[in-house]
Amino acid sequence: MKRQAAFIDSKKLLKGALHCHTTRSDGLGTPEEVLKKHVVHGYDFVALTDHRYYNFANYGDAPLTIIPGMEMDGSLPGAGWPYVHCHHIVSVGPEKAQGNGFEQDQRFDSY
């Protein structure tokens, strides 16, 4: 079997992060600090996906594409302190202008 390159040379490859946390949940940097680090390291896009907080704030001055998003987790009450996470779901987009109904910094405790 002949080996072939996985990517076509004529296409532009983008460097990005689709799962990223800030101090709005358990991350170590503010949204602005996280975006700045990604810019410094040459990223083209980043999705801010804090736990149970939907991020769609306008960071229009950032020189990379910001994708709004959120991470939800399912939990089992009474299975440990204070609960056991059994799965995580990362969602990205759509933008607020498209009518998703979420408020910035609104916490979601169920889905």
Language model features: what each stretch is:
Residues 3-111:
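A metal-dependent hydrolase metal-coordination microenvironment
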